[in-house]
Amino acid sequence: MNKQLSGFIAILFLTACAVQKPEQIISVEDVGRLIKTLSSDEMEGRGTFTPGIDRAAKFIENEFKQIGLKPLNGDNDFRQDFIVKRIKPQTIQATVNGKIIDQQNLLIISDLPSSGFDQSSGNKLILIAAGDQFIQKYREITAMKTPVLVLVDNQHAQMFKRLKDNSSRGRIVEKQNQSAAAMFILGESDAANYKVSFSNMIEELPLFNVAGMLPGRSKAKELVLISAHYDHLGIVKDVDGDAIANGADDDASGTTAVISLAKYYKKLNNNERTLIFVAFTAEEIGGFGARHFSSLLNPDDVVAMFNIEMIGKESKFGENAAFITGYERSDFGEILQKNLAGTDFKFHPDPYPTQNLFYRSDNAILAALGVPAHTISTDQIDTDKFYHTVNDEFETLEVAIIHATIQAIALSARSIVAGTDTPKRIPKLNSRP
């Protein structure tokens, strides 16, 4: 740790003590212990639906128990169980104008166990032409509620193949759409006569968030969320003898922050608002943990969400700095920065607007419901060569950076936790995500 960073930490805690008089309970050693454990090979990359993520969940549960958090209202423990379904195509057949279509040119997107239709069914026929935006069209079509036949120009063959490969591994859904079926056919431009049929294998799979709380004092009904996702990619393609995507920065670093902040606020024991600490599952495959969590509460009760993602390395702005996604969408960042007055640490607006980071983490699920939900990060995402690789390991991180960022979050959140500041709401979407 260099002198400048050490000096910041000293200033940070002197300032904090002057305001809240907390004990210095977030230590570099404990931060290192947490992140090293969560990103160890024993956790096998914390892949969704694997024994590794179960081991990680048990570790987080035990930390919450030792800290003294309480389960969420109505729960008996810290594990928040729910079920999703994985849908894999088993059989798929199509005949167009008397010609049997090759399997590699067929893609079915449907939650139905099996079905079929032909030109007499009165279903829509849609063309995705050479100049069309394929992904935009794909999203619109798969959101439809009725069966549809889609003819795809060969110009989109590469993206078609990618989607077909993804589908063959299985799509994860929360709820089955019992009426829709989109049959995509590559390389055909006319279908005066057609007949298609398919069948899917559908299996139920368990998922689980880990969540605990510190009940508020005078404003217990007002909730502050402190979150990170604890899943990663699991076992991936072998690279030089290593196939474990440990996910040290993504997002064992954020999960470490959640545990550390829980310990910090439990020790202070003066939060006026209720604090909920949650480690989300399945962020990497679609944000299913955050989606389930958001369905269990009234989003209007959530005052703010501190989502913490990848804080393991120096930011683009140098030491003593992090950025906040969606900074301009509320005054959340301004409140945090105000509370850091007198320290060297600064929260900046997201410097990577083209990366759409605001929409790429669990905060987006709550933000869509009107919550001032933002992600705090230090990652230089445009140049991070370890992101989503087997090399995202503990040894690549700077624990002093993580430690300083966690303490900055602890101090900057104080007025929101105390109930004296309330960030402006974010405009809701028309429907729940």
For each predicted feature, which ranges?
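N-terminal hydrophobic or amphipathic helices/low-complexity stretches enriched
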Residues: 17-71, 214-216, 221-223
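Second-shell loop/turn segments in exported
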Residues: 21-25, 41-51, 81, 124-129, ...
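Soluble metallo-hydrolase cores and metallopeptidase-like ectodomains found primarily
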Residues: 165-247, 263, 267-272
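His/Asp/Glu-rich mid-to-C-terminal helical/loop segments that flank catalytic regions of hydrolases
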Residues: 383-433
